């Protein structure tokens, strides 16, 4: 079976891994980094992903960041006259990670395990799966991030029985899960979270503070300047990271704006205590889901054996202190919070291929599932934190006499009223025979698969007529749309490859022109006039070709110049070798001169020696 790669598709950064032997290995990207920024940029028809996209975000308005926050919604990104869904943008990141894995493994990769926040709903999970498909990946499993982290942490501890709390605060989402580990079984007891809370929000409180300080001092509102905002975002992210290691940091942004008297500069000294004050409400927001997860699992603090911190934002000292205070236990810092989730995904890939044995993963559904019933109430069929895969059926009936059809309104959430929960989908069961209200028996069945994706069936037990749907939210893509996007991704990948090759060719040709000019200058009178003229002509021909758009012409002119310069170099070396031989011959002639000079010797007698 071919390799299954593990991917942590993060809000801020993403990571790709593979199982080597029985150990998960993080694959470095071409820049040598173990994580890749989840940033996509569009420039002159070319798509850029990762560090190169992030670097030019300040000057390029066509840069997309934190797209994960929009997964499962009908949000669109309009770039250069074209609309992109979150699935398409995410697919570009996944395709980049796929290419990184293929370069490392030296073989085609088409299968992956992708992680999602435990609190992702059905629409968000389906969107992630669609993104994988667009990127040319068969998503073998969608796995919850805290579960993946526990898998990586507990793989070598299968002989121990432990209850583990995983506190996962990433770039854009927050989850807390409680798992029981023992005898190779990883069972999720409960999960809770907030999909709109993460490192981006910690950056934002710093940005808001800097904007307020600058406005107070200079009377200029930087929040209205897109370029200034991007510089502030980069500075805020850096300051946040710095304050995890030092007690204060200097934020310096020269020429951030301009006033009546000339350029304005931002200089702010941010202390850790001030940052903790600014972010206090965010940290407190993480505590309620933590308490909820503990309550749902039926555990007290003394029952928890280990606390694992996941996600880059858990490096913030105030976050670590809050977790320690809440659970009463020092968090385990033996795992890399940026990589552990992806490593767990690779292990799950190994479980699927059979390379990892004696490991069973029992995950849960994060939110309750049900349907709307009379009075606009939600009737729950599957409670949150139910182990998946699972199936549950319930009998319903009609609300009025001779009702010909029933409308099944599928919901996800914890509120008692249907309107307050998320609609996953609607469908109708029709052609119900005329009967008094309450007489027909309609069996509604919910199935949740191993990826947490929902299928719903409604069946009239009187006629055995059945209607079945896989939940498609308003943001989900049809098979036709996915197929079109897959083709677009393939075409764009080929176009991007051609553009890269063209850029490389132009750079090489430009470099060759420079080298030839330098070589001709250095050689001066050491080359013949005819050779020099030929090299000059070929060089000028290549320079002219570089001004045009004919790639084949550039390629052929480059090859012609390379040939001339090689011949020229060979002649120069030949001349140098001949000159060296002549010089050596002259030296040898001097050493073999036939003139013999007489020398005088004094005889030393033995007595003189004594």
From Swiss-Prot:
Modified residues (Phosphothreonine): 173
Induction notes from the record: By stress conditions e.g. heat shock.
Keyword set, alphabetical order: ATP-binding, Chaperone, Nucleotide-binding, Phosphoprotein, Stress response
Domain of life of the organism encoding this protein: Bacteria
Molecular function in Gene Ontology: ATP binding; ATP-dependent protein folding chaperone; unfolded protein binding
Cross-referenced NCBIfam families: PRK00290.1, prok_dnaK
Family to which the UniProt record says this protein belongs: Belongs to the heat shock protein 70 family.
Stated role: Acts as a chaperone.
PANTHER family: HEAT SHOCK PROTEIN 70KDA
Protein name: Chaperone protein DnaK
């Amino acid at each position: 079976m071919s390799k299954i790669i593990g991917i942590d598709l993060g809000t801020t950064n993403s990571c790709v891994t593979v199982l080597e032997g029985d150990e998960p290995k993080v694959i470095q990207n071409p820049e040598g980094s173990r994580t890749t920024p989840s940033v996509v940029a569009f420039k002159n028809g070319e798509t850029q992903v990762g560090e190169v996209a992030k670097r030019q975000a300040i000057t390029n308005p066509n840069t997309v960041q934190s797209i994960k926050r929009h997964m499962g919604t009908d949000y669109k990104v309009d770039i250069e006259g074209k609309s992109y869904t979150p699935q398409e943008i995410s697919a570009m990141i996944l395709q980049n990670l796929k290419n990184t894995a293929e370069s490392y493994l030296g073989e085609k990769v088409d299968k992956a395990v992708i992680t999602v926040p435990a609190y992702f709903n059905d629409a968000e999970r389906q969107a992630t799966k669609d993104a994988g498909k667009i990127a040319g990946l068969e998503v073998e499993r969608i796995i919850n991030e805290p579960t993946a982290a526990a898998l990586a942490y507990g793989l070598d501890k299968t002989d121990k029985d432990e209850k583990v709390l995983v506190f996962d605060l990433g770039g854009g989402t927050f989850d807390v899960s409680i798992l029981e580990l023992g005898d190779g079984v990883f069972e999720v007891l409960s999960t809770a979270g907030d999909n709109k809370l993460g490192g981006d929000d910690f950056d934002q409180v710093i940005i808001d503070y800097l904007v307020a300080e600058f406005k107070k001092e200079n009377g200029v509102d930087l929040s209205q300047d897109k370029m200034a905002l991007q510089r502030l975002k980069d500075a805020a992210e850096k300051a946040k990271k710095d304050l995890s290691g030092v007690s204060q940091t200097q934020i310096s942004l020269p020429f951030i704006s301009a006033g009546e008297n000339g350029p304005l500069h931002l200089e702010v000294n941010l202390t850790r205590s001030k940052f903790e004050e600014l972010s206090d409400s965010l940290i407190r927001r993480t505590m309620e889901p933590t308490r909820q997860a503990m309550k749902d699992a039926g555990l007290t603090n003394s029952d928890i054996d280990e606390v694992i911190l996941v996600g880059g934002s858990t490096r913030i000292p105030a976050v670590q202190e809050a977790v320690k205070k809440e659970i009463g236990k020092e968090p385990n810092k033996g795992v890399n919070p940026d990589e552990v989730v992806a490593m767990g995904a690779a292990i799950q890939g190994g479980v699927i291929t059979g390379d990892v044995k004696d490991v069973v993963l029992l995950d849960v559904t994060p939110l309750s599932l049900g349907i709307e019933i009379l009075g606009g109430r939600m009737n729950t069929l599957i409670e949150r934190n139910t182990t998946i895969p699972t199936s549950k059926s319930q009998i319903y009936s009609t609300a009025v006499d001779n009702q010909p059809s029933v409308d099944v309104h599928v919901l996800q959430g914890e509120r008692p009223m249907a309107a307050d929960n998320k609609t996953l989908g609607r469908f109708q069961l029709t052609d119900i025979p005329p009967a008094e209200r309450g007489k027909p028996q309609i069996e509604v069945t919910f199935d949740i698969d191993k990826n947490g994706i929902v299928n719903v069936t409604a069946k009239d037990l009187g006629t055995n007529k059945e209607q079945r749907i896989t939940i498609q939210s308003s943001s989900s893509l049809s098979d036709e749309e996915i197929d079109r996007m897959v083709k677009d991704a393939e075409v764009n990948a080929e176009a991007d490859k051609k553009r890269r090759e063209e850029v490389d060719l132009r750079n090489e040709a430009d470099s060759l022109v420079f080298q030839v000019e330098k070589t001709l200058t250095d050689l001066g009178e050491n080359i013949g006039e005819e050779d020099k003229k030929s090299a000059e002509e070929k060089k000028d021909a290549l320079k002219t070709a570089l001004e045009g758009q004919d790639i084949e012409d550039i390629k052929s002119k480059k090859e012609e110049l390379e040939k001339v310069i090689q011949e020229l170099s060979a002649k120069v070396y030949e001349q140098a070798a001949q000159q060296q031989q002549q010089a050596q011959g002259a030296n040898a002639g001097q050493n073999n001169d036939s003139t013999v000079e007489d020398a005088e010797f004094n005889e030393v007698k033995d007595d003189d020696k004594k």
